[in-house]
Amino acid sequence: MSSWSKSFTRLVNGVSLVAKEIYNQSPELQRARNGDLEGLITSSGKKALVAATDLVGLTSGKLRELSIRRSKEPSVVYFDEGDNKDNVVATPEVRSVNTKPSEKIVDSKVLRNEFSDEVKNSNREGEIKVSGVEAGEIIGVRAVESGTVTEASSPSEVVPPVKRRRPRERKVPSTPMARAYGFFNLGAALAWGAVKESTYRMVNGTPMTPDNQPALSSLMSKENAERLALGLCEMRGAALKVGQMLSIQDESLVPAPILNALEYVRQGADVMPRSQLNPVLDAELGSNWQSKLTSFDYEPLAAASIGQVHRAVTKDGLEVAMKIQYPGVANSIESDIENVRRLLNYTNLIPKGLFLDRAIKVAKEELAQECDYEIEAVSQKRFRDLLSDTPGFYVPLVVDETSSKKILTTELISGIPIDKVALLDQKTRDYVGRKMLELTLKELFVFRFMQTDPNWGNFLYNEATKTINLIDFGAARDYPKKFVDDYLRMVMACAEKDSEGVIEMSRRLGFLTGDESDVMLDAHVQAGFIVGLPFAEPGGYAFRTNNIASSISNLGATMLKHRLSPPPDEAYSLHRKLSGAFLACIKLGATVPCRDLLLQVYNKYQFDDEPQDPVVATSSVSS
């Protein structure tokens, strides 16, 4: 059997498993199994028809073309005393997208029409916009990336075009049956795409990549990768969250063409329409929720995996950001992630050494917490207290009156995402890079409580006040004292190039079993030394001229091949945040006194037990 037919067979098997999930989760189909055909017809006929036209992709692998028009409904509504949401004064509408796709079925070339090429000129840095709102105005929300902005060497330098998704307003599949159908359609679309790609290759031969390497399997062609990304953007919820996690992986884990396609999922989800938004507001805040506000903007500032953010003004005049959760996502975490796992397994996208099952387990736990906005509100208040005396950081106020388990309202604050700071002068970039690393070390080794989502939009820099505004604490978590003790010792061993110390602490932490081959141990130690480089020498470490990411990438394949066990659960979130801090410094091209910052923490740290420490040193850092 040829390789393409084997791949196709694997995906067909995966689609059948998803179809089984539809059956297991659908109460209507359970009625049919019990012989209640009349109940099946009356309760689910119309629902199934509507759901089938509101989901990701088609079984033919083609997309419905969306027609964009200007909505007749206003974007911003104002509430007077005693008014309800149907009695409002409207401002001119900003933008809206037709909530219903046209029935025209278009060729797969239309896949390209879901995206646009934008050219960002670096001398127009004040014009970065997110959903029609200037990025500098956004505070308390996760900004949707407006394209990669690189450092400008001159005012006339033009950044290469960046491929971006065109925003769409579409209902969130919110019932178990609708979400299961969505995954079924997505899997079928991938299968059809694989058939077309395989047919093309049988006739024309396997295409080659720009570096003269054979292209990916027909199952994971560029077009199929884009289908996967678009499907996840429409499903939202845990499905999109997993896609976003994959999008920030290294090329040693996920092939570059797939990463390029998954970049679309980082640009934001499809937008939830007003018809779904109002019922959530009614259910969470009461049918008179508008009495608590002066105005509410239905045009979202941002749309993410679990919810979307809207600007509003409270009765006391405070501008706020209201994060509103998509309906159904909290109850579909388990099934969503299992369906994504099936698709990933049957597309062979994830290498064996990644220990997908363990990663999925951790993802389920993290997502369950992120879907509870009451937990996030507590975490945000805790961070606000912890950082209240730390210069250079600000955590916005939580507004309890308009917050609930599925709605989080916080003070709206201004700033630009950290990656856009790359457009500013070197002194500012060095300052921001230093503050980012200072925060990361303090979170882990002082607070033992860390916000683990490294999304650059979660850190908004206010140049006027030289303050980094911190938002989105859904992924905040505590770390056990013993784990932090040993992790600090391991970091110091890496900085001191102490091979025995790295191996010993890695075994104590659970990164190694003690039965690894010499090849694996050597790769693990060398990777640790590379990560420890910024902390190895006094003075400033120039992240611009030292590419840590590419150096580790060269060792990634070896470690994946020879790894015997998954890392400890704490490592998934921790390393996501640590790598994010390093990548931010690389993006900024910052020079940071990393060793001094580490020693400042290390020399004040109180270990619960005192084995031989890798180093005893003094700090030369200035306050």
UniProtKB/Swiss-Prot annotation:
Q: What is this protein called?
A: Protein ABC transporter 1, mitochondrial
Where does the record place the Protein kinase domain? 295-583
Assembly and partners?
Answer: Forms homopolymers. Predominantly associated with a complex of about 500 kDa.
The species is Arabidopsis thaliana
Q: How does it sit in the membrane?
A: Peripheral membrane protein
Q: Give a brief account of the tissues where this protein occurs.
A: Expressed in stems, leaves, buds and flowers.
One cellular component (GO) term of this entry: mitochondrial inner membrane
Question: Which top-rank group of organisms is this from?
Answer: Eukaryota
Q: Where does ATP bind?
A: 301-309, 323
Provide the residue span(s) of the region labelled Disordered. Answer: 152-173
Pathway it works in? Cofactor biosynthesis; ubiquinone biosynthesis
The main enzyme category here is transferase
Compartments in which it is found: Mitochondrion inner membrane
A GO biological-process term = chlorophyll catabolic process
User: Which Pfam families does this entry report, sorted A to Z?
Assistant: ABC1
